[in-house]
């Protein structure tokens, strides 16, 4: 690949599939810039819609142990279930209850929702949405199916893979994002569209893969597209009618980013006002500065603050994002590329940023800062502190006071050689120049890789022991070789780096950990041959559930890590397990379907001979047998002594707006 032209190289690095890579290359030859985006779709003029008390409704759903009513079950993304019918003593009798295909065969991240006796779920592209009746034992009856109309250009600019991380529910509405950029609210009973708003524009390199959240009567969502030179953006819409409440950028002026007058008042060392979102980029790089917030969002209903992280700052060849020439000069703070790589706290009513902490200033490794911000109360130095915890891709587990952004802990949870430590006074990492890529053509070995100490796969925590988090982590590093910048037309790959992924330890690509964020050490660890790219689930039955890329779904003792149960699913697991109760039984459910960045070389059929394909994922995949894992796209449910039935997804579905009859809806967008 080193002998390729820059034009071919850019496309090969970000290839989502052979055909899509060719389509991306073809765009380099187009002279015309994309048309300006159309105005967001607005509902017909009507009287102001009543605002539902969604916070109280969500709290009621979460208080019912039978439900999995939110993305992480609760506002804080704890991914903890109080159910205990399935426990250490009887989990050995856990068997398949029923399973169903989703009519999609790309990577299945995310998780279903369960409210009452209904399950809701969203597939990978084409984003089939299902409502399933759970009232019958060992059976899932499809109530309706909806497939949105989409812009197929989104597939070619979806980094990395055409995944979807789920939906949210409140006030009788189910809300999700389509890959081609629509935030869509459906009537949860019928599957009919209530409203649709355009947030992302594929012609500009933008997509939606995240799961919107519903808080304070609003829907909050963000875009993807950092590898295509986008400018990150988060917006909020009224749940009742879809009217936009606010929209804030990740880069640009203080006004663009919605920084409040008291931004970072408690921690001025983290950066305050002064248009740093412009000034810390050379040559107006902020206009393509990345910072897309494509990960997970949490919410504190008492503080009325929403929390999320922003992604990497544009192209991966870092010298273009610094106005100087040496590592020392680029690490002074002058070229931090703010506010990429930042954990933000925003007021839900206005979008005003109360505080922001940039974890990896002047990111040189693609350590996207979008991982889940988990809300817990912790005892820190003898005091009870309302905290936000983030296991960042850069390999550090951060603990901050979620009220004002004060940094309380920052400990390595995986090998991380790019930084010695985090300076707790300034909040800045103490970088190691030898492991910090900068000059074009100089290869650097860095731990962890760009895929992170862990990627977006979410951790779980039991609130009864809120310092210990259960996480699947990545056990490999990378060789990163920055390249010269080529064509930078809007909507084209914006990377310009060669990346190779290398295992830290043969035969142990994944490690599941119980990690104490206060003490900064693991309580136990489990080594897995294949990556652990699923999220984890912890239950009051004393169990932690997780899945592996080669399809093993496992339950272990949460106190010791001892394996208590396992079953093999037909494809790799990159989805997040949930627990719920229906028809008198506790169930555990999870998606299977290999994909995501880790499985993209398999899901998209990339060239086994190009180890740099999919930003280095191809070399890792084909040298470690990922190509032997079958493709898939199913939801699986388990209970004690389940009957093991297969449900036909379109057998009883009814037509839903957006794609014709349910039986053929999936075909209309391909």
Residue ranges and their predicted role:
Residues 221-233, 281-282, 308-337, 474-505, ...:
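Short, conserved, GDST-rich strand-edge loop motifs in beta-rich repeat architectures
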Residues 77, 81-200, 538-539:
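N-terminal cofactor/phosphate-binding cores enriched in small/glycine residues
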């Amino acid at each position: 690949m080193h002998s390729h032209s820059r034009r071919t190289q850019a496309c090969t690095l970000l290839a989502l599939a052979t055909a899509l890579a060719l389509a991306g290359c073809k765009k380099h030859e187009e002279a015309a810039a994309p048309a300006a985006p159309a105005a967001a779709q607005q509902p017909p003029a009507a009287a102001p819609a009543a605002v539902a008390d969604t916070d109280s409704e969500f709290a009621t759903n979460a208080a019912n142990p039978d439900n999995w009513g939110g993305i992480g079950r609760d506002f804080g993304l704890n991914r903890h279930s109080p159910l205990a019918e399935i426990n250490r003593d009887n989990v050995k009798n856990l068997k398949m209850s029923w399973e169903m295909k989703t009519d999609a065969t790309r990577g299945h991240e995310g998780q279903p929702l369960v409210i009452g006796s209904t399950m809701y779920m969203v597939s990978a592209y084409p984003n089939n949405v299902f409502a399933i009746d759970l009232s019958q034992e060992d059976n899932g009856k499809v109530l309706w199916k909806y497939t949105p109309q989409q812009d197929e250009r989104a597939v070619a600019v979806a980094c990395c893979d055409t995944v979807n991380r789920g939906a949210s529910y409140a006030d009788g509405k189910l809300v999700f994002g389509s890959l081609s950029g629509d935030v869509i609210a459906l009537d949860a009973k019928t599957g009919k569209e209530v409203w649709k708003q355009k947030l992302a524009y594929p012609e500009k390199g933008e997509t939606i893969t995240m799961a919107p959240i519903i808080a304070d009567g609003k829907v909050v969502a963000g875009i993807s597209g950092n590898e295509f030179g986008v400018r990150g953006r988060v917006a909020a819409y009224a749940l009742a009618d879809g009217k936009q409440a606010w929209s804030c950028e990740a880069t640009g002026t203080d006004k663009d980013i919605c920084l409040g007058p008291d931004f970072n008042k408690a921690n001025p060392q983290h950066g305050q006002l002064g248009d740093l979102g412009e000034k810390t980029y050379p040559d107006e790089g902020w206009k393509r500065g990345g910072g897309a917030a494509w990960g997970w969002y949490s919410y504190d209903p008492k503080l009325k603050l929403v929390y999320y992280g922003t992604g990497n700052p544009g192209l991966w060849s870092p010298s273009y994002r610094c106005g100087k020439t040496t590592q020392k000069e680029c690490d002074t703070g002058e070229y931090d590329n703010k506010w990429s790589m930042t954990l933000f706290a925003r007021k839900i009513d206005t979008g005003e940023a109360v505080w922001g902490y940039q974890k990896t200033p002047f990111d040189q490794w693609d350590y996207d800062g979008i991982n889940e911000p988990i809300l817990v109360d912790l005892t820190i130095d003898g005091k009870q502190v309302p905290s936000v915890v983030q296991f960042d891709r850069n390999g550090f587990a951060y603990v901050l006071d979620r009220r004002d952004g004060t940094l309380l802990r920052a400990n390595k949870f995986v090998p991380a050689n790019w930084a010695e430590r985090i300076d707790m006074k300034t909040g800045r990492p103490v970088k190691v120049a030898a492991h910090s890529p900068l000059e074009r053509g100089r290869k650097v070995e860095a731990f962890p890789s760009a895929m992170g100490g862990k990627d977006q796969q979410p951790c779980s925590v039991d609130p009864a022991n809120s310092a210990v988090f259960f996480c699947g982590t990545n056990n490999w590093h990378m060789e990163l070789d920055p390249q010269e910048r080529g064509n930078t037309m809007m909507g084209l790959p914006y990377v310009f780096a060669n990346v190779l992924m290398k295992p830290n330890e043969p035969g142990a690509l994944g490690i599941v950990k119980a990690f104490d964020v206060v003490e900064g050490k693991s309580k136990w660890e489990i080594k897995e041959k294949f990556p652990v790219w699923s999220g984890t689930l912890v239950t009051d039955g004393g169990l932690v559930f997780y899945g592996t890329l080669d399809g093993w779904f496992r339950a272990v003792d949460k106190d010791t890590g001892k394996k208590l149960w396992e079953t093999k699913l037909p494809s790799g697991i990159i989805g997040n397990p949930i627990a719920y109760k229906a028809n008198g039984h506790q169930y555990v459910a999870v998606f299977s379907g290999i994909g995501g960045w880790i499985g993209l070389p398999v899901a998209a059929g990339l060239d086994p001979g190009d180890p740099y394909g999919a930003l280095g994922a191809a070399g890792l995949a084909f040298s470690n047998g990922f190509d032997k894992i079958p493709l898939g796209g199913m939801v699986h449910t388990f209970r004690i002594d389940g009957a093991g039935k297969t449900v036909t997804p379109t057998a009883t579905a009814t037509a839903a707006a957006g794609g014709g009859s349910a039986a053929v809806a999936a075909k209309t967008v391909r």
